[in-house]
Every structure is written in C-alpha cells, then in structure tokens.
C-alpha cells in the first residue's frame, strides 16, 4: 500500500485522498451550499471540507452495514433526488472499492435494465420518494432506501475510512459508471476512473493562452449555482471537480426537476457570482423579464449540453456575460479558454487538449481527439478508451469568420435531417427560432427519409388551452421568417405543422432526445404526411369542360405555390415551381375530381403550362373514369405537339470569371452574381489554397448565401505565373465558356510606389491573353479607383470624365497610378478588338446597410471608422473632413448591386470601351451628419463631445499619442486601443486638411453611369440612419 504523506502533482491527485487531505489542512473551507430541506426559501447549509469528508465516512459505514463487511468489490447503483448525496455516494463507494452505477431517473425501464446488465449491478439504492421499480424484483436485485442528506451531514465525527492507495495503485479505480444519453438508442455505459477525473485537475498544468487559463482555473474562487443534474457529467465536473480541484464554492439547486423557478429561487435567497444553467432552461428564462432582471446581478453565466439558440443568447448576453463550457460523458470537461464577451457563442479550445477540427461539410467541421503521449495528463477520453488513438465526437462546429481558432457548436452528426431526395440540412437553428416565439415551448423538425420537412410544436404552458388553429395562425409569421433562412428543399409548408400536447422526451442535460421523440410521436408524424397525401381536397373541379378543368388547375397551382397572375401558356417552372410543389399538386389534383383519377408527378413535368396540363387531364377524363394519367403514348404525343410552341427561346446565360472573391467587395459581388438568374457560372479566382472555406465563413458571417446556388467554382490562381498558374483543363474551360471577366483582385496599399505593383500587370496580361484566345469576345470589367484621377484639375477641365484619363499626373499615389496604367493597358487591348472593356472607378466604399450578419461591418482599418474611434477617445469630432467633406459614399452591399447591374444589364451596352464613375449621385456634407453623430456618441459614453476644426482635431490627436500608447500598454482603456488606428493615419488626415488629396470642388461626370444603373440613379444619400447602422457595427 502507498502513503498519503504528501499530495502528488496536479493531474496525479486521487479524489478520495485529496478530499481527506484538504479536510485535514483546511477544515473550514466551504465546498458547497445546500438548500435546507431542499428549499432555498428555508436558507442554505454550509458544507465545509471537514463535514463533507465526515459524511463520506458515515456513508462508508452505512454501505458496509448494507453490503456486509468486508463486502468485496461489487457494482451498486444509486438513483436519487438531485442533491449532494450523489457526490458523497461516489467517493464513499470508491473508498470501499465498489463500482457505482448512476442511472438517470429519466431512463425508461428498458434503459435501466440495459445498464444493470452492462454493469453487472448487484445492489440498488434509491432516495426516498423514488420508485424502486418492479423490474428489480424480476432481476432479483435487492434494493434499499438511502439515508437522508441531513443524517449524512451530521458533523458528529465517525470512524474514518482511509483510502490508502498510491497514484499507480488507485488511478484505475472507478469513481462512477455513467452512461450516454440514449438519444439515438439504449444508453451505453461509460466508466469514469480516478485517473480520468485527475485529467481535469490537469487544467492546472496548462499554460495561459491569450492571457487566460482554462475556465476551471480561471474561475477559481467563484460562488456558482450548479443548476444541472448531479448524476450527469456536467453536474459532476462543475459541481464536484470544481469545488475540490479549483476551490469554487458550489451552490446546489433545490430538489425536483431543474426549471426556471429553481434558478429564480436561488437568485432570491443566496448571493451568487455565477450560475451554470442548461440551454433549455435559459430558453425559458429568456421569456421572463422578471427572471432576466434577477439574472443580471451575476458576474457571468455558463452553459453546456447543447447550443444556446442565437435568439436566446441575444436576449441574455446584454444583461449578463455568457461564458460557455464544453464537456462530454466520454471526455469529461474539455479545457477551453474564455473568449471575448461578444463571441459568447464560440469556444477556444486549449491547445493541450489535443483536439483537431476535421472538415465534415462545406461549412462544418467535426471535433476529433487525437491521442498524444505528451498530453496524457490532459486527455481524459483516452483514459476512457485507452485502446483508441483517435476518437470522433460526432460534434459539428463552424469556424469563426475572422478568428480561425474560435469554433461555434452547431449540432451532432446524428441531428442532420436527410430527406428522401438526398438533400440534408441542420434543423437546430430553425427550431431555436421557433421556440423564440412566446407561445412555443419546444419545436421538433422531422423529415428523415421523407420528401418534405414537417414540424411538431409543443405550446408554452400559457398557451396550452388555445386551439391548434389559433396557435398555428399566431406562430405562422415566425415560420415565414424561418423559411427565409432554410434552403428551398427544407422549407416548411403550413400543412406540415402539427400542434402536440405531450412534452418531447429530453436527455438528462435537457436537450431534445431526437430518436426518442421520433419514436414517441410516430403516429403524429405519420398523420402529417398521410394528411398531405390523402387529406380532404382544398380544390374541387367538376371536370365538365376543358375550360373548367383549366380554371381548376389554375386554382390548384395557386393553392400549393402561391403563384398568381399566371398566363395559360406560362411555364410554371420558370416562375418558381419546384419539386415539392409538383408532389403537392399531383396529390391535390388526384383528389379534386368527382371521377377517380390519378395524376402523377411526371405528367406535370411533361406538361409545364396550365394549357398543356388542362388539355392532358381533360383528354383522359373524356376517355373514362378509370383512366390513369401517366407517361402513355398519348402524353408523349401531346408533348411533341405542344413542346415547340410553348418552350420559350432560351436566353443566353452569363459565365463570369471573378478574381478576388474572398475580399470585401468580392464577397458581396459573388452573392449578387449568383442570385442573378441570368448567371449560370462564376469562376472564383483566388490566390489562397483555403479560399473556399474562407468564402463560406465570410458569407455566413456577413449574412450572405454560402451555397451560391451551385454556380460558384473555386479556382486557385497565381497572378505572376504563366497562364495564371491554372491547369490546362481549367484554362481551356474558361476560354471555351467565359462570357465576362471581372478583375477585382488588386493589392491595396496607398504607401507603395508604382513599381511595387508590377506583378499586378503581369496578372493583367495573363487575363488579357485569356480574352485573346477565348471562343467569344469577352466583356472585361476592371474594378478601378477614383484615386486614379483625384488630382484631376476640374476647375480647368471640368468634371472627371466617363472616359480615359489622358493626364498621368491625375493619380494621388502609387496605388492610383497603378490603376490608371491598368486602365490604359486595357484600353489598348479593347481598341485592338481583343475584348470589350468597362472601367469601374470605385469611390469611397462604406460599410453595409442592408446585410446585417455578424461579419457585416465597416472594417475598422478604414479611415472613416478611424476618425470615429479617435474622436471617441478625444471626446471631440472634427467640424469638417477637408477635401473629403462631401459624402458621396456608397455602402458596399449597394455598390455590388450597382456593379451587378452593369455586368449583367437588362439592355447590353454597345461599344468597345465604357467608363463608369461609381459615386453616390446625392452628396450631403459631413456637417449634415454631425448633430446625429454627436448625439449618438454622447449617449454611448454619457459624456459631452466637442465639435472643433479638423486641424485642431488633428493636433489634439497628435498630442494624445503618448497617453494612448501608455493606456494601451496598460490595457486600461478600450477607447485608447481603438484610437491607435487614428494615430497610424495622421499623415492622411493632414493631407485631407491641406487639400492635397484633391480639390474640395472635384466633380465627377456620372450621366452614362446613371443611365446604365437605375440602382445607382435611385440611391439614397448618406443619412443618419446609415450612420446609426455603422456606429452600431463599431460598437457605439
């Protein structure tokens, strides 16, 4: 036997030894607060280390009396009220050498029996008030009632039971036998060894990253409510481990199911620093302003067990910081580091966890543990499964659009719904949106193996008495919002919504048990699909004449699709009719006539107009009531007869090469092009190898589509290589198919001389060579810049023309000169007949105002946000912006709409060269926006802001440089950190003030541009509403 004369190092401490050690050395250290008699209103009892260790010894004596002493190692089970007895039972059984099975009270009889058989359980212990189950008698397993908690916590000293094993002798002893949730079948046994628990203690060994330690260590000393089931790994980790390993004080919840009132009771009756609350309970709290207000008293909350719905987090986060935790039964507590408060939905996993994110789909990656001998002390999953080198968690995450080390939990692999057509989608976000409705407590989307998604809704307790129709009517606007975010194949039709009055099965951690829900509600789900196929027809057609049939088919099409104003000869598929509409229309028509008639989907596909379909149906009605409408010879003859007459001439589609899609303009422009029905394909040429993933992440963060309607093809290219570094096949494909090239990629650096841009000209030549060898004349669009002409002498020569710039002194810097040189080179190519040229001179690009994703922001690297950030630190705004005082800015999401209209015009422009000056035609001044800016910033900082001349503002910023640098180094001022960008642009601001950036009266010709872009012609001016949007993006 070993000795306990001293504690081993972190990661090698055995819980039974450690508890006795701290009870001896720190007897008054409070580990837990338990609600007296299980009711917070009666107060809380302190449980210090001495009392806790004594209660374990008392239970050891009781177990010996029940099992016989010495009993020898046995497997025993405990099921009880959600109180401290779980932890006492775990340590006591370990001291005695027994294995303790913790079977969830929510398990079915089948689940309990399965776990008993898997573990070889011989003895069953339950707290009072819990059913001992008849199945125990059938299995001939003796059962007994556990001592009450006050009895165990009696401070009177009892005989000590000393755990005398060394690390090597005790590390393989079982602390508890846990089990999986059984959400995809029967629960599976998962042993937790003392060595497994000690890996959580190994958090102490992990070095700080980004200045933070793993959460368990970082939150040392917190007093936290552990509102989780204590038999579950979440409750054990943040209840037992946190108190013993990390010196937390853990407040235990009241008895009974953990619901909103449990949290409120604790908040009302004990002082707390933080709380550990499941996502399902946070969902309920988000609907209660009263509890939300009480929650705001905490320093932070943490959660685990599933994703917090975005709508729920958005309500809670402004009131109390959310700091998420991640764990799993097989891997215990996964070491993560607290992220920035605004990134509450994301995890930063500590490098010493040894996890990898392996791509699973275009936008999801799976969390995978890879065994590393050097990380043995901090990889618990390989204590659970020592025979494995890799363990796939089946947990899928999405990467942060800007911070590649941050990951957001999205779903389990098993949560994906795969429809009968092979399309698959993630239902969790949609379910989260639905439960944000105040009348809905839970939502479940189904459809695996079916042709259509269906929804089951369980009403909130305050809405249970309302009729199904009233609930559906009230919730339907939320469904319409949900459908906007779902792919077309997954959208939910009103006929596929059912209200249920039985709660959905839940896992112990409170998440939806999807497999059990599917089984429990099989009848309801089948009823939805049966109703859609055999339900009472909502359209009746008497079939007396072909005109009547035609009118009835029109009504049926409107019923299933909402399409109105269809002409008899319109092709329904060009108007948005899809495969789901076809299935529903076939079912509706099959039951709409008085005579028996079966209309197959194929009949609709081969008769895509109202006239064709009506004629086909009418002809078969005429042949007799038993005729079946199918792909018969008659149908083929009818198709041959009408196909040519009704098929509209195909409009040529655009095949576009777009360079630099991962940049700001490129991201929005790709979205615009792919949403244009006249565009068939977009080759996305980028330099980086991971352009596709970056594009997906960027699109998701900006609120843009990341599917691009299957039109986008990502190709890596090298601007300085021959043939752009493309493969021969890739190059030939572009030469054979491309109709247009948009050259958007260009190095942006206003400090470089013209010579530094020479690689750009090499790439430009390669693109022109593609045009020279293409099968058709390419329309070439070059994204230029107004900096190519900012020194244009408009006082002498008038507005900057929509034409080639003949003066080589017009650019303001090397960047502008590079753009001007490119314009002239391309003009030469156009005049030689190689290509048709359009020059797009882009002005000041502002932040987005219509797309509102998390990543849709005006980047702080730009000079306008730099002025705002510096002004926030100075508490002063400049009176003017010098030569930039006229606000002819265009928001980036509107600019790309303009470009899209020019690239894919309604009426193509004739001519070999076209020049467009892309500036807002409506030009308010900076001073017009000052009152709103001043008021917004004063409200944000609760302070007064001055308005001072630009030159004085620059002087103040220069004078504040030392203070800003000092505050940044001390980390004492967020405004100082932001103001740094203004310091870097001081020279630029000086140029604005001196007017060297160009005349204040510089004018730009726009007649041709406005004639070709109605979008630009109707554009709003820069407004206070736009500034409010940008200020919100910047956090003001």
UniProtKB/Swiss-Prot annotation:
- Please summarize what the entry says happens upon disruption of the gene: Impairs the production of fusaric acid.
EC identifiers of the protein = 2.3.1.-
InterPro entries named in the record: ACP-like_sf (IPR036736), Adenylate-forming_Reductase (IPR051414), AMP-binding_CS (IPR020845), AMP-dep_synth/lig_dom (IPR000873), ANL_N_sf (IPR042099), Far_NAD-bd (IPR013120), NAD(P)-bd_dom_sf (IPR036291), PKS_PP-bd (IPR020806)
Which region ranges are annotated with the description Thioester reductase (TR) domain?
658-899
UniProt keywords (A-Z) are: Multifunctional enzyme, NADP, Oxidoreductase, Phosphopantetheine, Phosphoprotein, Transferase
Keyword Transferase belongs to the record: yes
Report the top EC class in one word: transferase
Q: In which pathway does it act?
A: Mycotoxin biosynthesis
GO terms (molecular function) for this protein are: oxidoreductase activity; phosphopantetheine binding; transferase activity
**Adenylation (A) domain: annotated segments:** 21-343
* Record-linked SUPFAM superfamilies: Acetyl-CoA synthetase-like, ACP-like, NAD(P)-binding Rossmann-fold domains
State the Gene Ontology BP annotations.
biosynthetic process
Q: Which domain of life is it from?
A: Eukaryota
Q: The Carrier domain covers which part of the protein?
A: 544-621
Annotated positions of the O-(pantetheine 4'-phosphoryl)serine modification:
579
- Would I find rRNA processing among this entry's keywords? no
Practical use, per the record, is: Fusaric acid is phytotoxic to plants such as cotton and banana. It has been shown to induce programmed cell death in plants. In addition to a mild toxicity to animals, fusaric acid exhibits acanthamoebicidal, antioomycete, and antimycobacterial activities.
SMART domains in UniProt: PKS_PP
Copy the domain comment: Contains three distinct domains: an adenylation (A) domain that activates the substrate amino acid which is subsequently covalently linked as a thioester (aminoacyl-S-PCP) to the 4'-phosphopantetheine prosthetic group of the second domain, the peptidyl carrier protein (PCP) domain, as well as a thioester reductase (TR) release domain.
Give the protein's function.
Non-canonical non-ribosomal peptide synthetase; part of the gene cluster that mediates the biosynthesis of fusaric acid, a mycotoxin with low to moderate toxicity to animals and humans, but with high phytotoxic properties. L-aspartate is suggested as fusaric acid amino acid precursor that is activated and further processed to O-acetyl-L-homoserine by cluster enzymes aspartate kinase FUB3 and homoserine O-acetyltransferase FUB5, as well as enzymes of the primary metabolism.
Name of the protein described by the UniProt record: Non-canonical non-ribosomal peptide synthetase FUB8
Organism encoding this protein: Fusarium oxysporum f. sp. lycopersici (strain 4287 / CBS 123668 / FGSC 9935 / NRRL 34936)
């Amino acid at each position: 036997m070993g000795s306990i004369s001293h504690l081993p190092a972190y990661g090698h401490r055995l819980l039974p030894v450690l508890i006795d050690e701290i009870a001896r050395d720190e007897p008054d250290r409070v580990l837990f607060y338990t609600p007296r008699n299980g009711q917070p209103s009666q107060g809380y009892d302190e449980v210090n280390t001495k009392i806790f260790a004594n209660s374990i010894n008392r239970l050891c004596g009781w177990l010996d009396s029940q099992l016989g002493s010495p009993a020898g190692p046995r497997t025993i089970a405990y099921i009880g009220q959600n109180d401290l007895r779980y932890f006492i039972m775990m340590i006591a059984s370990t001291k005695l050498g027994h294995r303790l099975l913790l079977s969830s009270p929510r398990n079915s009889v089948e689940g309990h029996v399965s776990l008993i058989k898997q573990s070889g359980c011989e003895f069953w212990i339950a707290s009072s008030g819990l059913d001992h189950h008849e199945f125990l008698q059938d299995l001939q397993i003796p059962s007994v009632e556990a001592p009450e908690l006050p009895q165990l916590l009696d401070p009177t000293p009892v005989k000590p039971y000393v755990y005398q094993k060394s690390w090597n002798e005790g590390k393989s002893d079982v602390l508890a036998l846990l089990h999986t949730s059984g959400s995809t079948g029967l629960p599976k046994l998962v042993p937790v060894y003392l060595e497994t628990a000690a890996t959580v203690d190994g958090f102490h060994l992990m070095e700080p990253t980004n200045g933070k330690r793993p959460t368990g260590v970082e939150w040392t000393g917190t007093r936290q409510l552990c509102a989780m089931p204590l038999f579950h790994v979440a409750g054990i980790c943040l209840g037992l481990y946190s108190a013993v390993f990390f010196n937390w004080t853990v407040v235990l919840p009241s008895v009974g199911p953990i619901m909103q009132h449990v949290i409120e009771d604790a908040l009302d009756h004990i002082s707390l620093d933080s709380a550990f609350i499941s996502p399902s309970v946070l969902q309920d709290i988000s609907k209660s302003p009263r509890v939300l207000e009480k929650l705001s008293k905490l320093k932070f909350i943490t959660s685990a067990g599933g994703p917090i719905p975005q709508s729920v987090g958005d309500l809670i986060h402004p009131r109390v910081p959310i700091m998420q935790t991640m764990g799993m039964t097989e891997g215990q507590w996964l070491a993560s580091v607290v992220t920035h408060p605004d990134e509450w939905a994301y995890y930063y996993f500590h490098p010493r966890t040894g996890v990898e994110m392996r791509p699973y789909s275009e936008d999801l990656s799976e969390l995978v543990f890879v065994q590393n001998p050097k990380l043995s002390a901090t990889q618990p999953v390989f204590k659970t499964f020592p025979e494995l080198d890799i363990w796939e968690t089946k947990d899928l995450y999405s990467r942060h659009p800007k911070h590649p080390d941050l990951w957001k939990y999205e779903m389990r692999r098993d949560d994906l719904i795969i429809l009968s057509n092979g399309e698959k989608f993630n239902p969790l976000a949609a379910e989260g949106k639905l439960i944000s409705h105040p009348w809905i407590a839970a939502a479940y989307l189904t459809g695996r193996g079916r042709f259509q998604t269906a929804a089951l809704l369980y009403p909130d307790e305050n809405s249970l008495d309302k009729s199904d129709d009233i609930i559906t009517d009230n919730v339907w606007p939320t469904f319409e919002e949900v459908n906007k975010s779902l792919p077309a194949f997954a959208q939910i039709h009103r006929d596929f919504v059912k209200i249920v009055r039985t709660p959905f099965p839940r896992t112990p951690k409170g998440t939806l048990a999807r497999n059990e829900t599917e089984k429990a509600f099989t009848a309801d789900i089948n009823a939805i699909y049966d109703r859609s196929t055999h339900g009472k027809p909502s359209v009746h057609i008497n079939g007396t004449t072909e005109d009547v049939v035609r009118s009835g088919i029109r009504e049926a099409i409107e019923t299933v699709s909402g399409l109105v104003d269809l002409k008899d000869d319109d092709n329904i598929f060009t108007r948005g009719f899809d495969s789901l509409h076809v299935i529903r229309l076939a079912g509706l028509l099959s039951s709409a006539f008085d005579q028996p008639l079966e209309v197959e989907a194929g009949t609709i596909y081969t008769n895509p107009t109202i006239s064709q379909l009506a004629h086909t149906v009418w002809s078969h009605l005429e042949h007799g009531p038993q005729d079946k409408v199918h792909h018969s010879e008659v149908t083929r003859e009818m198709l041959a007869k009408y196909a040519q007459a009704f098929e509209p001439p195909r409009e040529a589609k655009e095949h576009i090469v777009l360079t630099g899609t991962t940049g700001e303009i490129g991201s929005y422009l790709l979205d615009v092009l792919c949403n244009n029905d006249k565009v068939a394909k977009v080759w996305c040429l980028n330099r980086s190898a991971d352009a596709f993933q970056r594009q997906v992440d960027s699109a998701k963060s900006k609120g843009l589509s990341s599917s691009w309607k299957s039109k986008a093809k990502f190709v890596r290219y090298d601007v300085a290589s021959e043939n752009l570094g493309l493969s021969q096949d890739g190059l030939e494909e572009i030469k054979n198919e491309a109709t247009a090239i948009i050259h958007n990629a260009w190095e942006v650096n206003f400090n470089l001389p013209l010579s530094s841009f020479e690689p750009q000209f090499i790439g430009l030549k390669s693109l022109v060579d593609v045009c020279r060898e293409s099968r058709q004349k390419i329309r070439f669009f070059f994204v230029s810049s107004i900096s190519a002409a900012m020194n244009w002498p408009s006082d002498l020569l008038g507005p900057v023309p929509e034409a080639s710039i003949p003066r080589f002194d017009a650019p303001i810097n090397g960047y502008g000169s590079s753009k001007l040189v490119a314009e002239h080179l391309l003009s030469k190519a156009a005049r030689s007949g190689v290509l048709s040229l359009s020059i797009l001179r882009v002005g000041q690009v502002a932040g987005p105002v219509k797309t509102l994703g998390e990543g849709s922001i005006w980047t702080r690297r730009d000079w306008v946000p730099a002025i705002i950030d510096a002004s926030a630190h100075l508490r002063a705004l400049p009176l003017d912006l010098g030569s930039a005082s006229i606000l002819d800015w265009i928001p980036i999401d509107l600019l790309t709409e303009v470009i899209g209209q020019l690239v894919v015009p309604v009426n193509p422009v004739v001519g070999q060269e076209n020049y467009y000056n892309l500036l807002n035609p409506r030009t308010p001044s900076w001073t017009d926006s000052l009152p709103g800016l001043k008021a917004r910033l004063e409200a944000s900082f609760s302070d007064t802001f001055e308005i001072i001349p630009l030159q004085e503002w620059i002087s103040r910023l220069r004078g504040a440089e030392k203070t800003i640098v000092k505050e940044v180094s001390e980390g004492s001022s967020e405004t100082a950190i932001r103001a740094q960008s203004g310091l870097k642009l001081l020279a630029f601001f000086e140029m604005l003030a001196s007017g060297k950036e160009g005349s204040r009266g510089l004018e730009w010709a726009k007649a041709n541009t406005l004639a070709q872009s109605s979008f630009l012609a109707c554009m709003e001016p820069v407004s206070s509403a736009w500034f409010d949007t940008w200020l919100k993006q910047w956090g003001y």
